Amino acid sequence: MVAAQNTYAPAIRFDADDRNDQAIIDARNIAVTFKVEHGTVEAVKDISFQLYRGETIAIVGESGSGKSVTARTIMGLLTKRASVSKTATVRFNGDDILKFSSRQRRALRGNRISMIFQEPMSSLNPIYTIGSQIVEAIRVHSKLSRKQAEARALDLLRQVQIPEPEARLKQYPHQLSGGQRQRVMIAMALSNDPDVLIADEPTTALDVTVQAQILNLIRDLQKKRGMAVVLITHDLTIVKQFSDYVYVMQHGEMREHNTTERLFAAPNHPYTRKLLASEPHGSAKPMPENSGVLLTANGVRVSFMMRYGGLFKPELKELVAVDDLGLTLRRHETLGIVGESGSGKTTFGQSLLRLNEPVAGEVIFDGERVDGRSRSQMRPLRSRMQVVFQDPFASLNPRMTIGQIIEEGLVINGLGKTKAERLERVRDALEAAGMPGNILSRFPHEFSGGQRQRIAIARAVALEPEFILLDEPTSALDLSVQAQIIDLLRKLQDERGLSYLFISHDLKVVRALCHRVIVMQRGRIVEEGPVEEVLNRPKTEYTQRLVRAAFEIA
């Protein structure tokens, strides 16, 4: 591993004795139910936790565990369909905030207790400037004049280390990057010097290097202000390096809690042990010695024409997304492509399948030129080249049954002479992907995220391809489900001799699945080689930064 300083600032470790003082938040017996069409659903079942001044606690668990519902209960942000048990109490500095009036809660929220969310774009108003939104957050809870609030807003942007803060005040949310928008949300959350900051998956949608920057920023601001932090996440690397105390939730129940050090060293509950064991591990199986070349690309360049300027005199400019790229992919091989958002990795991958149009370069698949072919000329190759996307819910037609979704590809490519033959291939593909063959009449919304991704993989393998482009196929999944999909991809490759092009920002998954890796930055390849060599001994400063952000470094 790269010898370097810690990417994350170290957590201030609390002793068990430090938790004997009065808690700033003392939550007891929280139970939350939601009204649904045919009754009620228990989202949170009788949980309790404490938070102390200056401390960071992590509430961890997979999707549906109830961790975000717990946070929203504290903030008073539950929907009208939700009801909190009458025996529940949430004491903030000794006062039960569940008994507060709406007015009292509004005075507390964003003032003494603040919250930042996973996707800042959904929390920022797209029609107002950044400056006006921060000023509004300040003036709701203070008597500052507009001029004083504007000065305070500028100071906050400086504190969260946004470049060119004066210019950012006049910009709109869509003009900022994801990391910059999250910094704005932190500035707004801290605008009234809260005692508690609740961070609900604050870095999940961000690149690994930006994740490290945001978490270090929260830690630095916490030290300066003496805040307590509630961190809600499913990322155990972040939990280990960032929190002092951990609560583990599953199916709305508290499974285990302990200091971070003790919980990671000796987890007691089987579910906690399962979570810790779900971190991607292992490596790709060695390729057969006689593996020939399946796909090559040379000098690939992709650009888009973008509109710049005003409404009445827009100017068209060429934006070069990828420039002069090449690769070689062998049969039975998994080649990873990694890089931050905007690096061009997805654009490059899709250009190899002609899902977007390269303006230059050549792509050769199994000895045949792919570039320059018309749609009709590409059709014979489509069944041999398949793709699996990040979000299966977006790529599976919600109006079609699972059977129809998978059979559609067979019909289009003329595979299976009769309906019975096609349905047999559909069932075989589902079973190969770890799904039962009796789900053909069900719809995508009836399945979990992991099950939908298995269905998307089944749709791809039903056509018996030689090459599959996997575009972030595990990034939206919980850790344990992610591990299952990695095992499935390994199994299918071993059984069917598949070649994968695996696009990801998660270097842990890349290490577990790939033989070789390409590192991209700003549309160019900056480093490539065997996965262990690149991740253990990265040559470029950019790759070193990616590796430091992705792995725990002692």
Predicted regions and their residues:
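Conserved ABC transporter NBD signature motif
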Residues: 85-96, 361-370, 381
